[in-house]
């Protein structure tokens, strides 16, 4: 079987956890390929149990699935151990979780620098989660990072941390007037934490490619979304990694020719957390309705999400840059009871219409949405399990989004539960 990539097609928080959970029973491997604990997945089991995952792949909730934290992820050891403990206390078997030896470790100095830099940025801050993700990726690119495998060699680990802190402490003390970190203490704490996860360290790229050779199915799970990609997102208001489909190969060690399906996750409206452009953002009662009805609060940050109407411009853009073959449309039920449902079909930038993503940061910031209004529906659709059971106006809305986005809407979420899903086309079927 081939590998399948699951990605967010907006600014994150689209419902990727539900999609992974839905498919989890039919795949053998679930891999997280980028990001860190700066994003969260919410999974609601048929029993009604609610799980919020920040670092561990959503497949951990499906028995028999092997879960991998890939080389493209940055791992906070404390968060990892706390999340494992929380799952185990609720009866979840975590034995089948592996960590790539080449994933990078998020260190205390990354968190310290992230928080202080964001604080000093004032009105120019980009709205980071303050969890050290950006500084950790900076060290990775600068070839100064600490890899997971380094905990297996305490002498090398101590040498690398001492070298890193020579500079980090200068920055903390002399620029930001903060307390220096003790290298020996940092090493000691990390080695103590490593006792709880070093048995999970593996050559993930080898295991994943061997699994594909055995005809097993690998699901590659991204965090955040396309518009937060450091290269393809609304820079500089982006994350520090590549959530887009290209990042799945790099962050897992699986070659791109192994990937035949790219499943994009689209919310039936649009949200984003933190700063940055958002052309369809609502500041009226409709925005408040979407936020309240959709429960739009960040899983990781607890911050209220900004809400707006569906933006077909960014959906088309996501289809293009990811090569999306199928879409999973989530939270369609939230739109029930609206008299009309606007869809952004293009932008006006300085009086000129464009149906494509503006090329420059300043143009995106000035983009004004051009709307097409569709009639709404009043029926409760949370019990619908086939496309034909949806009200005609809800079906029309889905088909219009499909046409505008440029890829087939294969699954539709009509509620938070795993079973509250309409499947129009099997995304795991052979292509």
Swiss-Prot record:
InterPro entries: Adenylosuccin_syn_GTP-bd (IPR018220), Adenylosuccin_syn_Lys_AS (IPR033128), Adenylosuccinate_synth_dom1 (IPR042109), Adenylosuccinate_synth_dom2 (IPR042110), Adenylosuccinate_synth_dom3 (IPR042111), Adenylosuccinate_synthetase (IPR001114), P-loop_NTPase (IPR027417). GTP binds at residues 12-18, 40-42, 305, 331-333, 413-415. Pathway: Purine metabolism; AMP biosynthesis via de novo pathway; AMP from IMP: step 1/2. This is Adenylosuccinate synthetase. GO terms for cellular component: cytoplasm. SUPFAM superfamilies: P-loop containing nucleoside triphosphate hydrolases (SSF52540). Its cofactor is Mg(2+). It is an enzyme of class 6 (ligase). Mg(2+) binds at residues 13, 40. It comes from Mycolicibacterium vanbaalenii (strain DSM 7251 / JCM 13017 / BCRC 16820 / KCTC 9966 / NRRL B-24157 / PYR-1). Substrate binds at residues 299-305. One of its GO terms (biological process) is 'de novo' AMP biosynthetic process. It is found in: Cytoplasm. Keywords: Cytoplasm, GTP-binding, Ligase, Magnesium, Metal-binding, Nucleotide-binding, Purine biosynthesis. Binds 1 Mg(2+) ion per subunit. Belongs to the adenylosuccinate synthetase family. GO terms for molecular function: adenylosuccinate synthase activity; GTP binding; magnesium ion binding. IMP binds at residues 13-16, 38-41, 129, 143, 224, 239, 303. The gene is purA. Its EC number is 6.3.4.4. CDD domains: AdSS. Plays an important role in the de novo pathway of purine nucleotide biosynthesis. Catalyzes the first committed step in the biosynthesis of AMP from IMP. It catalyses: IMP + L-aspartate + GTP = N(6)-(1,2-dicarboxyethyl)-AMP + GDP + phosphate + 2 H(+). It holds the Pfam family Adenylsucc_synt. Gene3D superfamilies: Adenylosuccinate Synthetase, subunit A, domain 1, Adenylosuccinate Synthetase, subunit A, domain 2, Adenylosuccinate Synthetase, subunit A, domain 3.
């Amino acid at each position: 079987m081939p590998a399948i990539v699951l990605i967010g097609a907006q600014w994150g928080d689209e419902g990727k956890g539900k999609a992974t959970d839905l498919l989890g029973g039919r795949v053998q491997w679930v891999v997280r390929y980028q990001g860190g604990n700066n994003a969260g997945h919410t999974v609601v089991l048929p029993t009604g149990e609610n799980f919020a995952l920040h670092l561990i792949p959503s497949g951990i909730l499906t028995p028999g699935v092997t879960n991998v934290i890939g080389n493209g992820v940055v791992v906070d050891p404390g968060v990892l151990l706390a999340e494992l403990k929380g799952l185990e206390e609720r009866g979840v078997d975590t034995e089948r979780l592996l960590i790539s030896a080449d994933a990078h470790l998020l260190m205390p100095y990354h968190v310290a620098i992230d928080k202080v830099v964001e604080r000093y940025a004032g009105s120019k801050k980009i709205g980071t989660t303050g969890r050290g993700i950006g500084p950790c990726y900076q060290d990775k690119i600068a070839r100064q990072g600490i890899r997971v495998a380094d905990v297996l060699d305490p002498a090398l680990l101590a040498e690398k941390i001492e070298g890193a802190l020579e500079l980090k402490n200068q920055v903390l003390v002399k620029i930001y007037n903060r307390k220096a970190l003790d290298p020996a203490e940092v090493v000691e704490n990390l080695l103590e934490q490593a006792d709880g996860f070093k048995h999970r360290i593996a050559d993930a790229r080898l295991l994943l490619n061997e699994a594909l050779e055995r005809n097993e199915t690998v699901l590659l799970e991204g965090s955040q979304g396309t518009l937060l990609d450091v290269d393809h997102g609304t820079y500089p208001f982006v994350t520090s990694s590549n959530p887009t489909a290209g990042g799945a190969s790099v962050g897992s060690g699986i070659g791109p020719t192994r990937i035949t399906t790219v499943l994009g996750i689209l919310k039936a409206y649009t949200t984003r957390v933190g700063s940055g452009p958002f052309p369809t953002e609502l500041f009226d009662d409709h925005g408040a309705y979407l936020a309240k009805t959709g429960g739009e609060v960040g899983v990781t940050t607890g911050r209220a999400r900004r809400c707006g109407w569906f933006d077909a411009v960014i959906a088309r853009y996501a289809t293009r840059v990811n090569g999306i073959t199928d879409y999973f449309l989530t939270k369609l039920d939230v739109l029930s009871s609206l008299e009309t449902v606007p869809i952004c079909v293009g932008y006006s930038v300085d009086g000129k219409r464009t149906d494509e993503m503006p090329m420059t940061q300043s143009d995106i910031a000035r983009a004004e949405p051009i709307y097409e209004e569709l009639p709404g529906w009043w029926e409760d659709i949370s019990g619908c399990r086939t496309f034909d059971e949806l009200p005609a106006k809800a079906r029309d809305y889905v088909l219009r989004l499909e046409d505008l986005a440029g890829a087939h809407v294969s699954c539709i979420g009509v509620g938070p539960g795993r079973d509250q899903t309409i499947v129009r086309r099997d995304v795991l079927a052979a292509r």
